[in-house]
C-alpha cells in the first residue's frame, strides 16, 4: 500500500508528515487516518501542521497501516515487547507482537536489550507489524560497547539512531531532556532515576562531567529524522518512580527542557510527542497533563500509566489503568500499557494480553468521557445484544471475545445456552432483563397513571 505513496518522496531532504502538512499538502497517510478516525482530512492536516497530532510513519515501514496520535483522535494504547539477556527470543517476541495487534495495540515498542541479535529481532518485528514500531536506541548503543556506558561517544548514539531509522522504526524515545544540572534535584527522591535510558545518560554525565550528548547533538538527530520521517518520542528520564516523587522539581525541570526541544524539532518540521509519568496520585494527574500541554505547546502526551498507588505488585495493570483512564480523560493522546509483571519480571504473552485489555478499557473510557464521535456506539450495540440475550453478539463486541466466551462457558458450555435468556449468575428465574417492558404495557400504564392523577385532582 505505502510503496506507491512514498516512492515520489524518496531522496527529498524532508519527508515528514509535518513538512507536507505545513505546505498545505494532504498526504495519502493523512487521508487514510481521517477515514479511520471519522474526521476530515483537512482537520488531520491542520492538527499535524500545528504539532498537536502525529502520524508515526517511517518511509521504510511499507506494510504500515497509518494511525494518528493526538488530542483530536481517539486515545491510543502502546504495548511494549522486547527480549532481554535473561529471557525471551525472536519467536517469542513475534508471538507477543501478534497478540498485541490482535488485542488492539495501536503501536508497539521493541525494548529488546538482549536475547539474540538486536538488529534481526527489530527487523523481524518491523516486517511483521501493521502498526507503528517504536524503539529506544540507547539500549543498543549500550549493548554495542558491552555495557561500558562511560565508553559511549556521541557518534555511537548517532550511528545507532541512523540504523534504526533506516530499518523502518516509526518513532524513537530520545532521552535528550535530562541535563547535567538536573541531577542534584533527584537527591530528595525515594526511588531516584527509574528510567533505564535516563539512568544510562545520568551515569555517562556523572562519569564525564559533560552535558547530555543527546541534548548537545539534538540538531543532528533532527536531520536523521527528517530524512526518514521518524517521530520523536521525547523520553522523560526523570519521571517519578513512586507516588512520593510525583510532580517534583526534577520532573518539572526536565519537562521544561522537553518543551524547548519540542519547539526546536518543530522548527525543522519534525513530528514530536512527549513522554510522561509514571507514578502519580490521582489528585495530581490533571495537573500533570495540563502542565505538559503548557510547557510543550500541546504536543501529544504519551504516558506510562500512571500508577496511582505503589502497593500492588502483580496487579499494576489495574493500579495504572485507573490513572491511565483519568489521564486520557484530561487529554493524554496515548497510554503506554503496564502488565501484571511490572516491577517483577519480563512479561509473557498472557501478561501482554491482560495489560493491553486493561489499557484498551482505559482508553475507551476516556474516549467516551471526551465525547469523541462514535465512541459509545459499540457500548450501545453490546447493551442491546445483552438485553436481547444475544450471547454470540455480546462475545463478538467484547474487547476480549475469547475471554468473555470462556467465562460464560465455564458454567453453561452447551450450545443451547447461547440462546438462553439467563446466565449462571441469576439463573432462569431471577434475571431482571427478562422483564420486557413493551410499548403496549407502557401505554396502558400511562393511561392508568393519568386517571389516578385526575382522580386526585377531583374536589371532594
Swiss-Prot record:
Note on cofactor: Binds 1 [4Fe-4S] cluster per subunit. The cluster is coordinated with 3 cysteines and an exchangeable S-adenosyl-L-methionine.
InterPro entries the UniProt entry points to: ThiC (IPR037509), ThiC/Bza_core_dom (IPR038521), ThiC/BzaA/B (IPR002817)
Binding, Zn(2+): 279, 343
Binding site for [4Fe-4S] cluster: 423, 426, 431
CC cofactor: [4Fe-4S] cluster
NCBIfam families from the UniProt entry: PRK09284.1, PRK13352.1, thiC
Purpose: Catalyzes the synthesis of the hydroxymethylpyrimidine phosphate (HMP-P) moiety of thiamine from aminoimidazole ribotide (AIR) in a radical S-adenosyl-L-methionine (SAM)-dependent reaction.
Family membership noted in the UniProt record: Belongs to the ThiC family.
Protein name: Phosphomethylpyrimidine synthase
Species annotation: Microcystis aeruginosa (strain NIES-843 / IAM M-2473)
